[in-house]
């Protein structure tokens, strides 16, 4: 069983460095924005002591552990949802993952550039969160437009989808990410097909050690 986790954040905050630490991939991590363009991927076995014990009991010919596929995704910038900094391409890479590891820079070092020329972790978090939310709004607006064209068919499922989409659009418009919007299990099941980025589980990782190479 494999699980896909995207490593995201602003440019030059330590995403590739974290990716290297997790995967031992040794990919390029340089002190300039957009060091990464095409996503890097690495698969890591998940340690599980239970698997070791089961192996001793069952003695199978082969043991296949669960794995996590980490994806080092190029940095997003303000305006990414409008295509800034190849944003649409990078957002598409995030959409293909099942979870997000959001890397935030928390260290001062004049030798390591910051895309906004200042260290403000809270603002950096808000920029990424807002770009994911804006991307989801665009996705749902397109879905809404498409469903409205089919509404004359009288299909009840279309009305349910439109109602759920509207609920999420209202929340997203307030700056609330999809995973924090108050909804029930039926809503989640209906909205899943649209693969909203801000609905994915998100882990916040702070990069607080200023090594010489962060990207």
What are these regions (language model features)?
Residues 3-8, 13, 19, 148-204:
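C-terminal-of-GTPase-core extension/linker across diverse P-loop GTPases
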């Amino acid at each position: 069983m494999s699980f896909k986790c995207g490593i995201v954040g602003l440019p030059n905050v330590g995403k590739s460095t974290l990716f290297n630490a997790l995967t031992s991939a040794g990919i390029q991590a340089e002190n300039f924005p957009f060091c990464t363009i095409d996503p890097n991927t690495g698969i890591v076995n998940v340690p599980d002591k239970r698997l070791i014990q089961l192996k001793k009991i069952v003695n199978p010919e082969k043991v296949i552990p669960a794995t996590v596929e980490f994806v080092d995704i190029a940095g997003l910038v303000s305006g990414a949802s409008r295509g800034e900094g190849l944003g649409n391409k990078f957002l598409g890479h995030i959409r293909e993952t099942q979870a997000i590891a959001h890397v935030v820079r928390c260290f001062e070092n004049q030798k390591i550039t910051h895309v906004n020329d200042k260290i403000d972790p809270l603002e950096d978090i808000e920029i990424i969160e807002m770009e994911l939310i804006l991307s989801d709004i665009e996705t749902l607006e397109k879905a809404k437009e498409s469903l409205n064209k089919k509404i004359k068919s009288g299909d009840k499922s279309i009305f349910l989808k439109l109602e759920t989409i509207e609920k999420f659009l209202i929340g997203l418009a307030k700056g609330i990410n999809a995973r924090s919007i108050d909804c029930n299990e039926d809503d989640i099941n209906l909205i899943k097909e649209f693969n909203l980025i801000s609905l994915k589980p998100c882990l916040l990782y702070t990069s607080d050690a200023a090594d010489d190479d962060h990207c």
